């Protein structure tokens, strides 16, 4: 992996974001996702690499493009594994709400955990709290530790939690400690990464979300030096979701075992979910969010706002790109 490849990876998420953004606010979440998938797949196909999708849009029989195991790129060059979410927060995009983005993680072949399409209990926190907070602790314990690490009182802390029924007790506990809760409807990747930057107003992410997005978050937090832990959730009673209507706890355990995951209660650290020597996170805003703006369409250009975090050179690059249209007459600053 090199800087040229990283630049091309940036362009992958930019093109996906632009494609989705054309449908922002139209209530067409599936169409927005499909547009992002197609644009991402098209741009990946132009990269000189032996790419492979390890986390994508589903199994081969479930998705026409960017399915798990799909080979992408020219077929020659460096081996790169990808975890992708071309339109993270499809509902946010469809309803023109904050926080939707095109996002991916990339690493050398074998460098990303092939997370099953399960749920994951997650804990993200700033670099100052790395290795000090722990997902095994109660929320109360972690808030006390976080308060000490950041030299803030607990009532100055803000914790992002997915707005789900399963988090009722968690939210009650956090508020009972005096900390603020910021519920979000979708899109916990951006919230997790925001914990890694001071000044975002986000100090911690707690609770259960999708496991594939956990790998993408872990890649970013590993590159940032932040704290991230994840533990797979295989009990539908804990996840409290209708998506697993046909699955039982026993059936999910069997699925994990068939995938080679025998330590089903393992707590994964960021460097286990994203273990490659070189790890890259790339995200581009579809709608405005915590970290960057969404796509802006102007008469003569399209503007994108993106973030690339890389272990290759230990950088986090915020990038504003002007995509100039054919026949443009004037580009404003």
Swiss-Prot record:
Could you tell me the keywords of this UniProt record?
Calvin cycle, Carbohydrate metabolism, Hydrolase, Manganese, Metal-binding
User: Where would you find the membrane-spanning parts of this chain?
Assistant: none
PANTHER family recorded: FRUCTOSE-1,6-BISPHOSPHATASE 1 CLASS 2-RELATED, FRUCTOSE-1,6-BISPHOSPHATASE CLASS 2
Q: Which reaction does it catalyse?
A: beta-D-fructose 1,6-bisphosphate + H2O = beta-D-fructose 6-phosphate + phosphate; D-sedoheptulose 1,7-bisphosphate + H2O = D-sedoheptulose 7-phosphate + phosphate
The function of this protein is:
Catalyzes the hydrolysis of fructose 1,6-bisphosphate (Fru 1,6-P2) and sedoheptulose 1,7-bisphosphate (Sed 1,7-P2) to fructose 6-phosphate and sedoheptulose 7-phosphate, respectively.
What positions does the entry give for Mn(2+) 1 binding?
A: 33, 57
Q: Where does Mn(2+) 2 bind?
A: 85, 88, 213
Cellular component, GO annotation: cytosol
Write out the GO biological process terms: fructose 1,6-bisphosphate metabolic process; gluconeogenesis; glycerol metabolic process; reductive pentose-phosphate cycle
MF annotations from Gene Ontology: fructose 1,6-bisphosphate 1-phosphatase activity; metal ion binding; sedoheptulose-bisphosphatase activity
UniProt similarity note: Belongs to the FBPase class 2 family.
Q: Look up the record and name the cofactor or cofactors this protein needs.
A: Mn(2+)
CDD domains noted in UniProt: FBPase_glpX
This protein's assembly is summarised as: Homotetramer.
| Top-level EC class as recorded in UniProt | hydrolase
Q: Which organism does this record belong to?
A: Prochlorococcus marinus (strain MIT 9312)
Q: Does the keyword Hydrolase apply?
A: yes
Q: Which InterPro entries match?
A: FBPase_class-2/SBPase
Gene3D superfamilies, alphabetized = 3.40.190.90, Fructose-1,6-Bisphosphatase, subunit A, domain 1
The taxonomy runs: Bacteria, Bacillati, Cyanobacteriota, Cyanophyceae, Synechococcales
Q: Where does substrate bind?
A: 88-90, 119, 164-166, 186-188
Q: Under which name does UniProt file this protein?
A: D-fructose 1,6-bisphosphatase class 2/sedoheptulose 1,7-bisphosphatase
């Amino acid at each position: 992996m090199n800087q040229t490849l990283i630049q091309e990876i940036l362009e992958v998420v930019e093109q996906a974001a632009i494609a989705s953004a054309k449908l922002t606010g139209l209530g067409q979440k599936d169409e927005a996702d499909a547009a992002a998938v197609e644009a991402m797949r098209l741009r990946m196909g132009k990269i000189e690499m032996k790419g492979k999708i390890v986390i994508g849009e589903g199994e081969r029989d479930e998705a026409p493009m960017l399915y798990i195991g799909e080979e992408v790129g020219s077929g020659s060059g460096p081996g790169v594994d990808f975890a992708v979410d071309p339109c993270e927060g499809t509902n946010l995009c469809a309803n023109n709400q904050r926080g939707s983005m095109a996002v991916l993680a990339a690493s050398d072949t074998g460098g990303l955990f092939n997370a099953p399409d399960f749920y994951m209990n997650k804990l993200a926190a700033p670099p100052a709290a790395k290795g000090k907070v722990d997902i095994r602790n109660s929320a109360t314990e972690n808030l006390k530790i976080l308060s000490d690490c950041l030299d803030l009182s607990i009532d100055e802390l803000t914790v992002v939690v997915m707005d789900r029924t399963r988090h009722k007790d968690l939210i009650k506990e956090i508020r009972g400690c005096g900390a603020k809760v910021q519920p979000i409807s979708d899109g916990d990747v951006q919230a997790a990464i925001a914990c890694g930057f001071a000044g975002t107003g986000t100090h911690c992410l707690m609770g259960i979300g999708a496991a594939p997005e956990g790998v993408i978050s872990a890649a970013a937090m590993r590159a940032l030096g932040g704290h991230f832990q994840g533990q797979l959730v295989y009990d539908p009673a804990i996840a409290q979701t209708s998506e697993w209507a046909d699955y039982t706890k026993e059936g999910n355990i069997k699925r994990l075992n068939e995938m080679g995951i025998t330590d089903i209660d393992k707590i994964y650290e960021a460097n286990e979910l994203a273990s490659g020597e070189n790890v890259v996170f790339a995200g581009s805003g579809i709608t405005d969010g915590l970290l960057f703006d969404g796509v802006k369409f102007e008469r003569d250009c399209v503007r994108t706002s993106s973030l690339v975090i890389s272990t290759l050179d230990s950088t986090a690059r915020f990038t504003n790109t002007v995509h100039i249209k054919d026949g443009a007459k004037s580009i404003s600053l």
